[in-house]
From Swiss-Prot:
This is Protein SDS24. It comes from the Eukaryota. The keyword Magnesium does not apply. Present with 2840 molecules/cell in log phase SD medium. Belongs to the SDS23 family. GO terms for molecular function: protein serine/threonine phosphatase inhibitor activity. Residues 1-22, 55-74, 424-447 have a biased composition (Low complexity). Coiled coil: none annotated.
Length: 527
């Protein structure tokens, strides 16, 4: 086992055109509104998606080009409301869209969204370790596995397969293929083509590049994670369109798609997406809220994701408050033998390891926010999904609503910035499990991700109320972690599938698409 595991590797400039505004954009504005569209021509810029591990671009000023956008109406999240045109944002790579497509996003051909230069296949004969190395090298989340060159019905290898492989190596799961099990546990190379057959998957959906977004919405809105885009003759795969790339494209170009505005202005509660009561049984169209206690070992979290066929899991405390998020892609942090002890430490501890790792990689503290509130607008939710590159966000009860019957409006820019700054300073003083990373890296308490992704906290929020800890109390890591990172009681979840399904039902002909059909096809395992 050791020999097999040791083969895994360790893991803009501002626009010169400034908007004529007399004030700085607030955090709420930046997060709740899509980027401005500069004057571009079709195929002016390469539509390249950022690598999976890269930091989202800094929000900088960029003036809209002539004729690209009429004066847009405001998008709503928290009060007060702001006009779209008030927010200076930078151009994003996906904005290669001509204004002729305004209000007609359903008719855009799929050829606009594919990345031909990023299409990579691997043969099924290579080992799981080599396939994993390819994911890391090219910053991918999945990769097609060919049985032969030009295979049009191939499987895909992703981090769910890697998680299954790790659990098989550790003898935590069993499969019918006894030879493959023996090879895994004896440290022999295992062909990736055999491994991908063990994890239930959806069919390899294919659509020609001349099909429209309206067509693909019906497939991705059913819970299928990715679709292959072929040439018009359907004889060659030209690209892969994932749920996440589709959402990023729609968000980056939302100013051109004015028909989306009423939905973007609406709250999750009003749109009836996401499970908003963890105690009640979800409907057939809703995702279940799947979580794990922070004190449970990491290996149980990985096992639970494998059994439930999910790509991330919420970590909660004993009172049901959200502590953090563990994604199946985080399995890359435990693929070497030297990292195996982490598997038997708590999920709470692993979250701190992930944060430390991000700090070392990016040179600054990183604390992505994976939660929204029932009152959060769809616009804010999309912005967070794009910025965190995640497939789902956890819906939490606002902190003050669980302790006081009198609700207070959430404060905006200056309060949020002060809260983030205070939290970052507390981290630098050794208040959180991130402190070791903080002391050895450059602290940037006003980094774009930290400030733009922070929901404005309430006056009762623990991020504001906690004073710097005394040296005597700084060793009490669990309590400090719970106070510093708790965001509210977990009451629901909203996923990319939920949002794409909503758009498909509301604005395309796919009125009856079921967001849970693909997951039911993949199935959960009863062990």
């Amino acid at each position: 086992m050791a020999s097999t595991s040791n083969t895994f590797p360790p893991s803009q400039s501002n626009s010169s055109n400034n908007l004529p505004t007399s004030r700085h954009a607030s955090i709420v504005e930046m997060l709740s509104t899509p980027p401005l569209l500069p004057h571009v021509q079709v195929n002016d810029t390469d539509d390249k998606e950022q690598p999976e591990e890269s930091t989202p671009p800094t929000a900088t000023a960029a003036a809209p080009g002539p004729g690209c956008a009429a004066t847009p109406a405001p998008l709503r999240d928290e009060k007060p409301q702001f006009k779209l045109s008030a927010v200076p944002m930078t151009q994003t790579p996906s904005q290669c869209l001509s204004c002729v497509h305004a209000q007609k996003w359903q008719h855009i051909p799929l050829s606009q969204l594919i990345e031909q230069n990023k299409l990579i296949f691997v043969p099924g004969s290579i080992s799981v370790e080599e396939a994993f190395n390819t994911l890391i090298k090219y910053h991918l989340n999945s990769i097609p596995v060919e049985s032969f060159p030009g295979d049009m019905n191939c499987f895909t290898f992703d981090y769910n397969d890697l998680n299954s492989y790790l659990l098989l190596v550790l003898n935590k799961i069993t499969v019918s293929n006894k030879q493959l099990t023996a090879d895994c546990q004896n440290g022999k190379p295992v062909p990736v083509g055999e491994m991908v057959k063990l994890t239930p998957k959806n069919p390899f959906y294919k659509l020609p590049e001349n099909e429209s977004l309206s067509t693909v919405m019906g497939i991705l809105g059913s819970g299928v994670h990715r679709v292959a885009i072929t040439n018009e003759e359907m004889t060659k795969v030209k690209g892969i369109l994932s749920q996440r790339r589709l959402i990023k494209y729609l968000w980056d170009n939302a100013r051109s798609f004015t028909s989306l505005e009423p939905l973007l202005n609406s709250s999750l509660q009003d749109l009836h997406i996401g499970v908003l009561n963890i105690q009640s049984k979800p409907t057939s169209r809703q995702s279940r809220v799947i979580s794990i206690q922070g004190e449970e070992p990491l290996i149980m979290g990985l096992y639970k994701m494998h059994v439930e066929r999910i790509s991330s899991i919420a970590v909660i405390d004993k009172q049901g408050n959200l502590l953090g998020n563990i994604s199946v892609t985080d399995v890359k942090h435990v693929t070497r033998t030297s990292q195996y002890p982490l598997l038997h430490k708590t999920c709470r501890h692993f979250i701190s390891v992930i944060l430390n790792s991000r700090g070392l990689e990016t040179g600054k503290d990183s604390f992505p926010i994976f939660h929204v509130y029932p009152s959060s607008s769809l616009a804010r939710t999309l912005a967070k999904l794009v910025a965190t590159k995640s497939h789902r966000l956890w819906i939490v009860q606002p902190p003050e609503s669980s302790t006081s019957a009198s609700s207070t409006n959430l404060t905006a820019a200056n309060t949020a910035a002060n809260a983030v700054s205070a939290t970052a300073q507390s981290s630098a003083n050794g208040a959180t499990p991130m402190s070791k990373s903080s002391s050895s890296t450059s602290l940037n308490s006003h980094s774009p991700l930290m400030t733009a992704m922070e929901d404005p906290p309430s006056p009762r929020s623990s991020a504001i109320a906690i004073p710097p800890p005394s040296p005597a109390s700084s060793t009490n890591t669990p309590n400090l972690f719970e106070k510093e990172y708790r965001t509210g009681k977990l009451i629901g979840v909203v996923s990319l599938t939920d949002i794409i399904n909503l758009l498909a039902r509301k604005q395309t002909g796919n009125k009856e698409v079921d967001p849970q059909s693909a997951r039911r096809q993949r199935g959960s395992i009863a062990m």
